Amino acid sequence: LAKRLQRMGVDAYRQGFKLNLLPDRLDEPRRRKKPTIYFVNSMSDLFHERIPDAFIDQVMKTIRETPQHRYQILTKREARLGAYFATRSVPDNVWLGVSVENRRHGVPRIDLLRTIPAQIRFLSCEPLLEDLGPLNLDGIHWVIVGGESGAEARPMHPDWARAIRRQCEAQGATFFFKQWGGWGADGQRRSKKANGRELDGQQWNGMPVTVVDTTAGVSA
């Protein structure tokens, strides 16, 4: 997607995947009065090692000054996430999440996330690359599951998603099934739109209860 936006001449993506801080974007939520869910850094990671703490501080300042919005922040860099909030409080309107794509790298991130006192803590199991096995969802409020998209997408077995759904139901976490991605439930390759987002004949659209007064999401 970044390459496509670069070819289209979109200013923010002229450098492709090269890290590019855009402090001017931080004013947009202040101008928007209607309650909105923002997915922060949807194509990057706010806790990337090259993003200075000072910039993250600016992001958190904007978040605190716009309590009408909700902000989803997802990271694979759980160590830096923990270190950052070890000396700072988490804004009440922030949802903190970690990527949990597999057992080796993803599942261990859950333990650190659980220690951070965010109002909403969530897992993004997308792309789900294998059966995650037993999960401890204590302190986890929301779990997103989805398959991989793109030319090199790997298939997701339906049983992997079902296992997570069952554990969410048993442990009181809200379950959201986002998409099949490039491979359908039947194991056939097709467009993600054609594959849809039904699991066992229905959509699973669980969301944390705090979203009842917000609009559809916006990436930032």
Give a label for each model feature.
Residues M43-D45, K76-E78, S99-R103, E126-L128, ...:
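Active-site beta-loop-alpha junctions enriched in small/polar residues
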Residues F39, Q72, W95-G97, F122, ...:
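A structural signal for isolated positions on well-ordered beta-strands in alpha/beta enzyme cores
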Residues R32, E65-T66, T115-I116, A170-Q171:
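Alpha-helix C-cap/termination motif
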Residues V40, I73, L113, E126, ...:
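Conserved, mostly hydrophobic/aromatic
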Residues L1-V94, R103-G106, L132-I140:
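Conserved Radical SAM active-site core
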Residues A118, L129, P134-A220:
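Auxiliary Fe-S-binding modules of radical SAM enzymes
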Residues A54, Q58-K61, A83, D111-T115, ...:
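Alpha-helical scaffolding segments of alpha/beta enzyme cores, especially the outer helices
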Residues F85, S89-H141, P155-R162:
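Short loop-to-alpha-helix "cap/lid" segments that border enzyme active sites
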